[in-house]
Curated annotation (Swiss-Prot):
Pfam families to which the protein is assigned, alphabetical: Pur_DNA_glyco
Coiled coil: none
Species of origin: Methanocella arvoryzae (strain DSM 22066 / NBRC 105507 / MRE50)
HAMAP family (alphabetical): 3MGH
Enzyme class of the recorded protein, top EC level: hydrolase
Keyword Cell membrane: no
Keywords: DNA damage, DNA repair, Hydrolase
Transcription regulation in keyword set: no
Name of the protein this chain belongs to: Putative 3-methyladenine DNA glycosylase
Length: 200
């Protein structure tokens, strides 16, 4: 499948967040190529979104968010877990999509070796920190161009048929913005990090 072009990311973030479901996230490692089907995302949109890192303006940490769409924004949470975001919308507008979970489709043995505590297929990348661990995504990739066939990129894939939209996870501090239904996941995937209430 072809690598997604920059135009894919240069669109409203909510559209990109939904359309990334079903696409293939690829990481080229010394041990070989590993790939995940993206099954869960979250949208973070601009300085008016209190859950967004850009809500208080540009900093050294979030500078990539203000740049060109189609680049990786990687940051650390809890001092130990990396999180991968893909920058969206026009250059200068801070928005991105967090890749929350993925389903292993290639190089599962390599990913399992990077996440030895994950004993089952659906546990390998069922969360943003787990996903980055399984694909060896670190802050060294912050700012990487995912529209080029380099170390990290996204390939096209079939659209997801049933998408669940619900509030984002871990953003209670954001007030009313915490209630926005800006988390999206593939209803039929067993690899999502957490299902919405009532979705069994």
């Amino acid at each position: 499948m072809p690598v997604l072009p920059r135009d894919f990311y240069d669109r409203p973030t909510l559209e990109v967040a939904r359309d990334l479901l079903g696409k293939t996230l690829v990481r080229q490692l010394p041990a070989g190529r590993v790939a995940l089907r993206i099954v869960e995302t979250e949208a973070y949109i601009g300085e008016n979104d209190k859950a967004c890192h850009a809500s208080k303006g540009m900093t050294a940490r979030n500078r990539v968010m203000f740049g060109q769409p189609g680049h990786a924004y990687v940051y650390l949470i809890y001092g130990m877990y990396n999180c991968l975001n893909l920058v969206t919308e026009k250059d200068g507008y801070p928005a991105a999509v967090l890749i929350r979970a993925g389903e292993p489709i290639e190089g599962e043995e390599i990913m399992s070796s990077l996440r030895p505590k994950a004993r089952k297929h659906h546990e390998i990348a069922s969360g943003p920190g787990k996903l980055c661990g399984a694909m060896s995504i670190t802050r060294a990739l912050n700012g990487a161009d995912v529209c080029a066939s380099g170390e990290l990129y996204v390939e096209d894939g079939p659209a997801v048929k049933k998408i669940v939209a619900c509030p984002r996870i871990g953003v209670d501090y954001a007030g009313e913005d915490a209630l926005r239904p800006w988390r999206f996941y593939d209803k039929n995937s067993p690899c999502v990090s957490k299902r919405a209430p009532g979705d069994i």
